[in-house]
């Protein structure tokens, strides 16, 4: 594993922190395909995305996990800003960097993500033809999720209050050195509305997977950008790359994987359902993760 810093040309002056996971027998004099792995909203490269990158490397693939702009060990202020457009652009910035590495075959770059990172990956692939194959795990279209709720039970118009809240947060931020925030996962166990989101609390705030660089919240000023965002915008026209979707049969978020499958223009697309798994199961529970990695490794090895 190699730690690298990735300067970006995104107009934000940000440097991304990343970890390259190398397969056994890696030889820098040869060329390899590589998989970019994007982390969930609120996560960091040492959590789910790093686990998938590590396991892909164990399957013989070169993989890179990175921290989003404003998060983890990457630079940028304000900290914990969740700008969906920058999150998607981060993926292309990593691809920029990969094209400079002599051991990367620039014609064989794939990308995958977990949770919101999956939605951002789909969006990056819509906009960046250098991404030749796309994988998603427990996909979340963050705009849909905030507008329509975890299980798609809320109408778009009811999300107007979030835009109002985010707008007011900007005014508050302008007057204070301490920025307004809100949770990306329940901050306390008692705040979780169901078992699946209780697991999100457990993942981010207990020894199960907590990390000091992943506080579990975002800036409230991000809300207006998120509410109007569609990670799958124009997927029915431009998402033509091979697409492998992985989701749990018990995931409340599964409808967002279904939507991606329906909307993607790709003629080579499929969904693999993992029996008994919920959204969070695919972050770190070994039997489920191993099944997901097996599917994704086969997919990337055959498409790149």
Where are these regions (language model features)?
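Conserved alpha/beta-hydrolase
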Residues: 55-75
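Alpha/beta-hydrolase fold nucleophile elbow
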Residues: 102-115
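N-terminal cap/lid segment of alpha/beta-hydrolase-fold proteins
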Residues: 1-30
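Alpha/beta-hydrolase-fold enzymes
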Residues: 122-203
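Catalytic histidine-centered segment of alpha/beta-hydrolase-like enzymes
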Residues: 277-290
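Alpha/beta-hydrolase active-site loop
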Residues: 48, 81-102
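The serine-hydrolase catalytic nucleophile loop
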Residues: 42-54, 68, 257
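Short beta-strand/loop motif that positions the catalytic acidic residue
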Residues: 238-239, 245-247
């Amino acid at each position: 594993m190699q730690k690298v810093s990735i300067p970006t040309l995104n107009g934000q002056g940000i440097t991304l922190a990343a970890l390259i996971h190398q397969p056994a027998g890696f030889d820098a004099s040869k060329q390899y395909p590589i998989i970019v792995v994007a982390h969930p909203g609120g996560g960091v490269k040492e959590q789910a995305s790093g686990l998938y990158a590590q396991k892909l490397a164990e399957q013989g693939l070169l993989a890179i996990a990175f921290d989003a702009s404003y998060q983890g060990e990457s630079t940028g202020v304000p900290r914990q800003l969740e700008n969906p457009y920058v999150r998607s652009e981060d993926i292309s910035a990593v691809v920029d960097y990969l094209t400079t590495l002599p051991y990367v075959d620039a014609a064989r770059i794939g990308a995958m993500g977990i949770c919101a990172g999956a939605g951002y990956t789909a969006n990056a692939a819509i906009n960046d033809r250098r991404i030749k194959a796309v994988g998603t795990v427990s996909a979340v279209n963050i705009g849909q999720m905030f507008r329509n709720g975890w299980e798609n039970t809320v109408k778009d118009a009811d999300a107007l209050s979030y835009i109002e809240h985010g707008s007011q947060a900007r005014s508050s931020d302008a007057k204070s050195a301490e920025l307004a925030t809100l949770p990306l996962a329940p901050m306390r166990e008692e705040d979780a509305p169901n078992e699946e989101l209780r697991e999100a609390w457990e993942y981010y705030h207990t020894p199960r997977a907590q990390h000091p660089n992943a506080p579990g919240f975002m800036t409230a000023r991000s809300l207006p950008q998120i509410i109007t965002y569609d990670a799958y915008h124009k997927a029915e026209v431009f998402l033509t790359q091979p697409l492998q979707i992985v989701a749990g049969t018990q995931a409340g978020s599964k409808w967002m994987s279904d939507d991606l499958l329906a909307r993607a223009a790709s003629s080579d697309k499929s969904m693999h359902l993992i029996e008994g798994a919920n959204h969070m199961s695919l972050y770190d529970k070994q039997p489920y993760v191993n099944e997901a990695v097996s599917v994704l490794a086969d997919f990337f090895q055959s498409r790149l």
